[in-house]
Amino acid sequence: MITDKHFTKIIDYVNNHTGLNILDPHSNSILIVGRIGESILNQVSIEVVEMGWYQCIIDISYNGYDDGFTTVFQPVKIVKTEEEVINLIDKSISISTKLMNTVHQLRKELED
């Protein structure tokens, strides 16, 4: 794994406190990916940019009835610290879970 000091806390947190995986690590960027339930894909792309800040692209996608995922949300956030990145990762997991639960509830309502 090729990473530097910019990702130490993030990697530790993801590995020990989430069900997400770290893919494609580089010296200035990492990609964090995981499924939430069967139908939600959560990806957080993190790159160290100017002044050592973190640019985070959060991609939350839904897989409906076909085999392809459709992006539902894709905000870009720039934060200053690893702790802020960790908060964004937690928020993306929470939003993904809410999306999954909402879709399941709507599907259930339609089937009743």
Q: Where do the language-model regions lie?
A:
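A generic alpha-helix structural signal
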Residues: 11, 89-90
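Intrinsically disordered, low-complexity regulatory segments enriched in Ser/Thr/Pro
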Residues: 38-88
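Negatively charged, low-complexity tracts enriched in Asp/Glu with abundant Ser/Thr
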Residues: 1-39, 68-73, 99-112
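Terminal export signals
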Residues: 88-89, 106
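Charged, terminal alpha-helix-loop-beta segments
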Residues: 81, 90-101
